[in-house]
Structure formats: structure tokens, C-alpha cells
Amino acid sequence: MFKKILIANRGEIAVRIIRACKEWGISTVAVHSDVDRESMHVRMADESVCIGSHQPANSYLNIPNLMSAIELTNADAVHPGYGFLSENANFAKILEENEINFIGASSKHIKMMGDKIEAKRIAQENGLPVIEGSEGGVTDIAQAKELCKKIGFPVLIKASGGGGGKGMKIVHKEEEFETLFSTAKSEAQKYFGNDEVYIEKFFQNPRHIEVQILAGKNNVVHLHERDCSVQRRHQKLIEETPSPVLNDEIRKDLFERTVKMVSKIGYMGAGTVEFIYEDGKFYFLEMNTRVQVEHPVTEMVTGIDIIKEQIWIAFSGETALKQSDIKPRGHAIECRINAEDASKNFQPSPGTIGMCHQPSGFRTRVDGAIFQGYKVTPYYDSMVCKLICHGRNRTEAIQRMNRSLDEFVIEGITTTIPLHKKLLSHKKFINSDFNVSWLDKDTIV
């Protein structure tokens, strides 16, 4: 087994990885920016190295500084978490060339799935339904307009190298197209260093469904699906498993096709294949070659530690799991707790946390890195922790989540806890009568 793992991340996911390593007796190295010196992940790790200033480009995205930290601490593996360099093919390639284990996908597969056009082509070749749209990148406006007329408005313009809702524009009518096309290209260049965009048919009322997989050279297994349809501006707020809208027949087809594609491309590690689902049909969206923020809901229903499985696959090249081992039980829900004021258009709320009481109890889990006196800075993602509740069924999971949200106290900053209370008690959520555009259309706060 690995002797020492460097965690190239911060916050709750760094703490989550350190906990998994500790259970296996693996030494850990935390890296941190100057403002994260007193953070929980730094306190919990066996060693820590400051890798730069608070700007992500100078620290958590600084590959030379990370490589120096790896050399300095003699780490034999790196876990990237999610975000930052977790899907950076160049970083994975540098580690491969230096014979340092990357606890994630190979640079080849990161690059393959990071190019959304290539990923769509591969998915289609391997039997997954894809969304109607351009065959590749689109540069000519006249050709783009013709394509839009063919598939019909509304359409979605997306950055080829993108994700997270950036470089993505919905065009409802032809008169808007030129302006939004230019804006999408500019955003794609700004966020991803590549202005290539592609066009797809826009679905008005879809659900967001994703399949968790674990793949070794010996076997590929799926850990069933997650429903991530409660979103605001393409950012997930609540995730759950199983999805309340899928039946067993659709699940079987979805899982078989997903496993087939992942097997065919020779993928290894943890991964998530995302789909949109509407009117009884699913369509490939993208594949994330890393652990997802929402992985705990899958862990709660399957009893499988996804982080440990990632580490084991990276070490041995194989997964110890068989599909018959995966027997989900009950229902799990996750709420992302962000340092934002939902009543003020989700304005960020940095500050120092005062009193902090985190809920506990039967089948209740908090993944976080906050404590009394912790400073929430404006430099990184606003999520401060995740609350996950498990029940025998969806009704019990909702009841447990409501109880846990009532118990959760974070003073000194404004959080999205009040928003989650409203969402969990809303009849649309209770009846599972919603889609990804629910919060963009309805006024909840």
C-alpha cells in the first residue's frame, strides 16, 4: 500500500481523504495557501507544506509548487480531490512521467473526457444516446444558425473544454443567437483557455441523473445512480439516491450501457457519467473523471467507501468489488451548505465562524472542515460543508434532513441552511415534481 499520500486540495474534501488514509495507516501531507494555514485539513494531516498565496493560480493550481511539495515530503501518491487540478490532464501526465501515483484517471482518459465533443463522440460510438446538435466545434455563425434552425430553438451553446455552467448560454430565439454565441466564446476562452463551443438541443424540463462507477483492469462496477436535479444556474444544491423518477427497466438499461462504455475505453478509477433525463429517455451529458462532491449519498446507501476504493484501484490496478457486492439500501439526501445569502441573490458571506454546532444522530453525517474561529475567505468555493441523511425510504430521509437542518447552527456567517429548510418542505420537492430549472423559474426565497 502507499506509504504517504499528498492531498492536492483543501477544505472538506481534503479532510475526507485524510480520514480515509488514517483508517488505512497511510501518512498524509496537506498543502495549503497562506490563508489556509490554520485550516482543518492542515491540522489533521501528518505533514503540511505552504505552496503559495491565496490566489488559486499561485497555490492550489500551481503545478511546480505542488511538485516541489511532493519531492520535499517524499510522497508516493497524490489525491487531487475535486476541482482545482483533479481533471487536469497535464498535471496527471507530469506525475506519470515522474513515476508518482495519481489517485484518479490516467492523463489519457482525463484528456479524452475533458474534451466534451470527443466525449460525446465516444459515448455515441459505445451505445449511449446523445443530445442532437453539432458534430464538433462550431466557429462559423452562419453555419451555426442553420444548425439551430434544423434542430429547433431553444438551443444550448456550450464550451468544449468547460463545465460547472461556465461558457454555457441558452438561446430561446434566433435574434439572440449572435450576441450569446459571442459571449459563450469569450467566457470559454476566459475560463478554459479555449474558445471552442458546440451547440445542442436544449431540454426545457430535464432531470439530472448520474451513474457512479468504479473501474479496475479486472472489472467495472456501477454504484447505481444519483439524482442531482435541484440546481441553481447549473450549480447543484441537493442530491439524492435513488432517483424518485426512474423505474427498474430504465435503470437496468442505463447501468448496462454506462458500464459497457467505461469498459470499452479501458477506464480505471472512480468516475461519474452524467445524463439528462426527460420523457422517459436519457441522454449522455459528460463524464467526470474524479470523485464528485455528492459521493457521500452513494456511500450511505451502498456502504462502500469511494475514497478508499479510489486509493485501492490506484495502488493495485484492480477493484476488489463485484457487481453482486453492490446492494443499495434505503434513501440518502445531501444538502450543500454554502456561505451565501440566498435572500440577497446568493451573495457570498465570508467571515469568522462563531458558535458552530453540527447535527449528529442516527444515519446523519456532516462532511466539513469548519469549526469555531474558522475564517471563511472569499477566495475559494463558497461551500463550507455537506449534510447527508439516510433513511429507510425517501420520506424518512427527508424527515431526518429536516431535523438535522433544524439542529445545525453556524454563527458569524450567513449560510444556505434556511434555503434548504424551505426546499425540503416545499410540495414540489416532497412530490419529486421538479426539474433542473425549478429554482431558476420559481421564487423560493
Language-model segments: what does each one mean?
Residues I7-I26, S48, E71-T73, G104, ...:
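ATP-dependent carboxylate activation and anion-phosphoryl transfer catalytic cores
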Residues M1-N126, V138-E146:
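ATP-binding N-terminal substructure of ATP-dependent carboxylate-amine bond-forming enzymes
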